[in-house]
């Protein structure tokens, strides 16, 4: 499975109603500065994956994002994949998604 998903692919999944668990894993300080995310996605602390990983459904694909699709998303994606989840992160992160789909 690919590690990344494009903003176009994600928008298509959301519009089609595909089963996906979307996670906002921005650093706490980034989230607190600007809490608006993609489709009212719940925020999960990227520094505390062990505290919330057990709450995720294994049957759904997990798509996560940080601000720019960098080290935060990549680190969390790896932890989820290593635990057996189908996980990808948004290429370019929240910034890219908001540019591609500004009304989301």
Feature roles, as predicted:
Residues 1-20, 28-63, 68-104:
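Rhodanese-like catalytic fold shared by cysteine-dependent sulfurtransferases
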């Amino acid at each position: 499975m690919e590690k990344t998903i494009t903003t176009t692919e994600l928008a298509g999944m959301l519009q089609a109603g595909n089963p996906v668990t979307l996670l906002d894993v921005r650093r706490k300080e980034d989230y607190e500065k600007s809490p608006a995310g993609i489709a009212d996605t719940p925020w999960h602390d990227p520094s505390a994956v062990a505290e919330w990983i057990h709450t995720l459904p294994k049957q759904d694909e997990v798509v996560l994002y940080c601000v720019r699709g960098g080290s935060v998303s990549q680190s969390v994606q790896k932890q989820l994949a290593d635990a057996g989840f189908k996980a990808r992160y948004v290429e370019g992160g929240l910034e890219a998604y908001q540019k591609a789909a500004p009304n989301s």
